[in-house]
Amino acid sequence: KGHNHRDLQFKIKQTKIETAQLDSILSIEKDWIDCEASVSVGQINRKTIPKKKMVPSLPEGDNFTVGGCLGGLALGSNSYIHGFFNNNVVDFDIVLGNGDLVRNVSKKNHSDLYYGIGGTYGTMGIITRVKMKLIDCESYVKINYLHYKSFNEFYSDFSLRIKEQKDDFIEAFVNSKNDFTIVCANFVKKVRKEEILIIKDKSILKQRHMCIYAQIANKKDFNYLRLVDYLERYSYSAFWGHYLYTPYK
């Protein structure tokens, strides 16, 4: 399935295989989480973050699935340290085009499939299960917005931060020809409740207010977010869709 491709003419006579019910988290241990392929990023975040654990390099939206992340070579704002999502996969199961079910694909078992799956977007087979690494985290992050008018200064500072790897998360924005922003986020152990920008889940007002562009446009210096809100800051309704109706100027 996926966007506007699901009803294309060439698919009319094809056999549809429904995978939406592969949505169970199978097990969570200290260093890994094992899921069926249609488990979403949002499901994972809400199970692991309360345990002070997270999957590195998840894309920043709540409805991406782990199977889609693996086939699509996903990444996030801590990928500059941890690599792509695929670099943090322990093993996975896949049904190939000839019907074979290949289990426990890893760096040492069917390594051709392990290293070849990224960027295939479902053409190699149907992923049914994915086991991912877990790393330590905190429940909150402090986000700093570093604003620049000079591209050279912006680029120099961004390059240095990437090299030093001191930030837990980092991304950068070119807002206009002479307006640039580095956005870095770091875990914090404690924060006062009144300092947290958003505390309510699935609220349109939350989604509107926490949009990273809103903070940049308002020239914020910093704010605090729950880690789950930061990790899902580009969820579809929050970012891709809502901006079309009321864009920030």
PLM segments and residue spans:
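Noncatalytic alpha-helical scaffold of FAD-dependent oxidoreductases
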Residues: 1-249
